[in-house]
Amino acid sequence: LSYRDGRYFDFVKEREFQFPLANIYNHDPIYGKTGTNLANQMTDDEFKTYLYMMGTRGTAFWELYYSPEMIDEGQKWDINAEYLEWAKKNYHILKNAKLIGTTPDKGNTYGYSCWDGEEGIISMRNPSASVKTLSFTLDRNIGAAESLKGKTLNRTTILNYKTTDAQTDYQTVKYGDVITVTLQPGEARIDRKSTR
């Protein structure tokens, strides 16, 4: 994840590409033996996190480079099916992805903020070996609609990986709030924000 996500930051922040992240073509996901060192490397939870984090990049083209003998490990076929159904159902939100945080190339926290109207999905990840925070303002700069001003947004969990703090669904935030999240080493979170 970190290498490819680092390229996204390079494209957007350094090279200033001016097109939607959904239009970037990737050879992803890859979970195969040929030309990789991936054999038997991901647990089911790691594989699920890998897929869902990639989904928040906003792309709709999935090549599924899998070695059958590797994808047969654990519940990976079921996880793949669950993920593809989720990505299709939520593509109207995911396709509007924007970067948050800073490049993972240097071990920094980052994620993607995806919105469609008053409904959003926000991913957050700490690729480093130490506890770090990620802060962002919930506003139009990360894709949240200005029509959310004055409204309360509920948070529901889509994915938690290596999360240690007690989280509960329906924590509330408002447009303009600064959200600061402490992320454990290797932790990833994906939340839905909506007025429902």
How would you name each of these model-derived features?
Residues 1-161, 187:
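Active-site-proximal substrate-binding groove within the catalytic cores of carbohydrate-active enzymes
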Residues 167-196:
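C-terminal beta-strand-rich structural cap/linker in extracellular carbohydrate-active enzymes
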